């Protein structure tokens, strides 16, 4: 992927090898020159080839630290494709070629001519290769860097030459006085370019070495100045910081380290549209980005591309430190590689507790601090006076345990700046007056904070830090925070794995090394200080371009974090020292940015096309309607006024006598403009009617005003009289109208409506607005629910509400939904049935009770199943399951009468047309074993053994599990052979006892339970039981269910001890009914369950 990016910026050519080859050749000469300068042995071994290379090809003195250093810098610059290195090497090759040509013209000895010819051939080949590969040296140096380094080099060489001249005057050896200055100049300033034989005599060896060292020192100082000039540009301008703060206002919640992007010893590069940015430092040739890009994640790729282009431009190696998983993935997609660097410790105050064995150490530390009289106070930085902030800064400096402030990706590096007013200060105060410790945390979005600074006085009581962190979590609600980042611990996994029992030798060695270096860098201390709070560990990554660059990226990270301090480095709090604004010109032109670095005047998308990118692209019709709305507001028209009730519904207006004045409101579905006369179709919940607008009858405005203002779908209110138009249509003859709701999105086709079923589910509000059938369905559902309630209440049943959130998964065999309550740190279930609570009411003496409410089952979704559904459960004391056969039939028939006007279900024919099916009268009743026998053509009953049942299943092609008992196998046969094949409503009774854990055994038939299921057209509508009231037997059955649940069965019920204790107080003989109301509505209306529900669950888009 990296190669792809480079090829895109610089097309592939046959000369891409030249920079690396040139760097290797010069690097080898530099290495040999260095070795020869320190080792007489090496100098002796390479004397002959060195002299040939020195005479005819390339300057190669016998001893010169300075020249070795020069060549090393040149080799690195060539490999980095620096354009300035190309100029230097090409110029040198041209000069050397001219020197050889001159030697050929003056030479009179053949062996000298041969050497010069070889050298000239090499130079010409090198010059040709360099010229052809010129475009491969694209990397530039920072503006001004070369001039500063050159001036420093000239000054250093001058000073070194003068000092060397003085040493030669004091210790000349055999060197003649007239040659001493020129010898010093040659050794220091010319890097021993002239042969030593050109001078009369020679100095002492030590003085000669010192002269070479002076030249090397001048070069090294120049290199430091070169690097320092790069670091001096590691600085934000005020406008850049202002732009970054604007991005943080919008997207700061994405990254806990985002606020540290405002650190002012970083530079920044923006995406072209200004909606994302990357902050970075340049250290030892590595452009080191910190954390994730700041801003809109959709613009991260553009920001990363701009950053990588900058790296290529200057020949820097790209590196990233502290990226999140999301950020690392974005960098990987741009061609970098990711390596886990450590883990960030995140505390969630809602889950934080001091109780529990794992928090014992923290709890004890907090107790000690409180006993020592330590209290904690919280203040935002803006709440501190200048004197108080000065005191805070003084404490921070006095309590720092290092000479310089450390940090790059996890530290802000400043205190007391007015721009950081939202930072949070946590102080530990002993005895009410003395501050003994402090935490400073920067904002993490609007509801989080990220640790920036932690200080404690040497005399602070033990446990002070633990007390501050704990109080921060416990008082988080009053502070307005819901997440806290303690920043990340580097190499956390290495500490954990190396300390585990059975850790391998490599893991233990790696941990030992980290512990050793922790004496200086506090790696283990940071890990352990965070670990004790039981945080959530979130991985952080380092990113690099090539594995060979990992050491360089590591060194750059160590320098940037302050663990290794280079000469002339500046890491103290600074004002804005950047010279060039990096923010895009379009963003600067808005005038929003501030030169003092404070947040922009108006927070929002910026840059070319940013407004369009910030939200989904709006369709043309929506943009037209938005423009109309804007024009209305400009004219002072309220498109969404306060409501006033109309005098009539549309249905009432249609029924009114001619000439009746009415005020109706509704949605405009159609409009026809005939020039001066306009007709529209207006619909409210009750009906639809025509409205007629005539310029001659309108009291205010004209029909043109109407067409200019109103679109199809708008809500309007009209006032007029009922009458006939010229064509005889019964209409509202409008005299006044007003807009009461502007529809910003167009309605679907006026004749077809929403034809896609998925669209109808997702946009039910639109479906209801335009589809009469959808309105009739919701009316039918309401009528069915009302009829069920009315029937039960008419029989003396009491309606109740029981908990939806339940601690025990029980009441039915089904897979539940799991949730969690933070207040009690407790897992809860969404109820799968209200049964167990309703039975508690029965124990308490409520003899007729029902609940019509929502239940939840984490199971499949199809035409007859929805995870959230409406369930009726009813219980009648002193009754049994036979009572509910007539009771259930009456409920459903009454519901059908309420919805359809007669006792009918609607069923689709083969052509899709719905036809009524009569359900009046009594319904069939069959036993389960009898129905299965009828379907099999072979008799079975409760005494049929398991082997026979399995054989019959194999014969019928019905699958079963080996651990099922006979009852479970019969139930599976019933579901496949009977339930799925049933058409007209039928009650199937007397189910096997083993599959009915809450049902009493049959009073006369052993092995079956008094239970029936009502099935119609393959759909189970309801079930009823003679309830099991024996608490001993009930406990035994639930214990069996709980064993199944413990064994991994997700549908088995858990043991509800509170319910069993309630049953031990005795429940009267009771018959219970459970009915799926959604399925009843489905069969009554002839539609699928998704059509009958106003808002069924739909997959995310």
From Swiss-Prot:
<comment type="function">
    <text>Catalyzes the production of L-lysyl-tRNA(Lys)transfer and the transfer of a lysyl group from L-lysyl-tRNA(Lys) to membrane-bound phosphatidylglycerol (PG), which produces lysylphosphatidylglycerol (LPG), one of the components of the bacterial membrane with a positive net charge. LPG synthesis contributes to the resistance to cationic antimicrobial peptides (CAMPs) and likely protects M.tuberculosis against the CAMPs produced by competiting microorganisms (bacteriocins).</text>
</comment>
<dbReference type="GO" id="GO:0000049">
    <property type="term" value="F:tRNA binding"/>
</dbReference>
<dbReference type="InterPro" id="IPR044136">
    <property type="entry name" value="Lys-tRNA-ligase_II_N"/>
</dbReference>
<feature type="transmembrane region" description="Helical">
    <location>
        <begin position="18"/>
        <end position="38"/>
    </location>
</feature>
<dbReference type="GO" id="GO:0003677">
    <property type="term" value="F:DNA binding"/>
</dbReference>
<dbReference type="InterPro" id="IPR024320">
    <property type="entry name" value="LPG_synthase_C"/>
</dbReference>
<dbReference type="InterPro" id="IPR031553">
    <property type="entry name" value="tRNA-synt_2_TM"/>
</dbReference>
<comment type="similarity">
    <text>In the C-terminal section; belongs to the class-II aminoacyl-tRNA synthetase family.</text>
</comment>
<dbReference type="GO" id="GO:0005829">
    <property type="term" value="C:cytosol"/>
</dbReference>
<dbReference type="InterPro" id="IPR004365">
    <property type="entry name" value="NA-bd_OB_tRNA"/>
</dbReference>
<keyword id="KW-0812">Transmembrane</keyword>
<keyword id="KW-0046">Antibiotic resistance</keyword>
<feature type="transmembrane region" description="Helical">
    <location>
        <begin position="183"/>
        <end position="200"/>
    </location>
</feature>
<keyword id="KW-1133">Transmembrane helix</keyword>
<keyword id="KW-0436">Ligase</keyword>
<dbReference type="GO" id="GO:0000287">
    <property type="term" value="F:magnesium ion binding"/>
</dbReference>
<keyword id="KW-0238">DNA-binding</keyword>
<dbReference type="Pfam" id="PF01336">
    <property type="entry name" value="tRNA_anti-codon"/>
</dbReference>
<feature type="transmembrane region" description="Helical">
    <location>
        <begin position="60"/>
        <end position="80"/>
    </location>
</feature>
<feature type="transmembrane region" description="Helical">
    <location>
        <begin position="151"/>
        <end position="171"/>
    </location>
</feature>
<feature type="region of interest" description="Lysine--tRNA ligase">
    <location>
        <begin position="602"/>
        <end position="1101"/>
    </location>
</feature>
<keyword id="KW-0511">Multifunctional enzyme</keyword>
<dbReference type="InterPro" id="IPR012340">
    <property type="entry name" value="NA-bd_OB-fold"/>
</dbReference>
<feature type="binding site">
    <location>
        <position position="1013"/>
    </location>
    <ligand>
        <name>Mg(2+) 1</name>
    </ligand>
</feature>
<keyword id="KW-0443">Lipid metabolism</keyword>
<dbReference type="Pfam" id="PF16995">
    <property type="entry name" value="tRNA-synt_2_TM"/>
</dbReference>
<dbReference type="GO" id="GO:0006629">
    <property type="term" value="P:lipid metabolic process"/>
</dbReference>
<protein>
    <recommendedName>
        <fullName>Lysylphosphatidylglycerol biosynthesis bifunctional protein LysX</fullName>
        <ecNumber>6.1.1.6</ecNumber>
        <ecNumber>2.3.2.3</ecNumber>
    </recommendedName>
</protein>
<dbReference type="InterPro" id="IPR045864">
    <property type="entry name" value="aa-tRNA-synth_II/BPL/LPL"/>
</dbReference>
<dbReference type="GO" id="GO:0006430">
    <property type="term" value="P:lysyl-tRNA aminoacylation"/>
</dbReference>
<feature type="binding site">
    <location>
        <position position="1020"/>
    </location>
    <ligand>
        <name>Mg(2+) 2</name>
    </ligand>
</feature>
<dbReference type="InterPro" id="IPR004364">
    <property type="entry name" value="Aa-tRNA-synt_II"/>
</dbReference>
<dbReference type="GO" id="GO:0050071">
    <property type="term" value="F:phosphatidylglycerol lysyltransferase activity"/>
</dbReference>
<keyword id="KW-1003">Cell membrane</keyword>
<keyword id="KW-0067">ATP-binding</keyword>
<dbReference type="Pfam" id="PF09924">
    <property type="entry name" value="LPG_synthase_C"/>
</dbReference>
<feature type="DNA-binding region" description="OB">
    <location>
        <begin position="662"/>
        <end position="740"/>
    </location>
</feature>
<dbReference type="GO" id="GO:0005886">
    <property type="term" value="C:plasma membrane"/>
</dbReference>
<dbReference type="GO" id="GO:0005524">
    <property type="term" value="F:ATP binding"/>
</dbReference>
<comment type="similarity">
    <text>In the N-terminal section; belongs to the LPG synthetase family.</text>
</comment>
<dbReference type="GO" id="GO:0004824">
    <property type="term" value="F:lysine-tRNA ligase activity"/>
</dbReference>
<keyword id="KW-0472">Membrane</keyword>
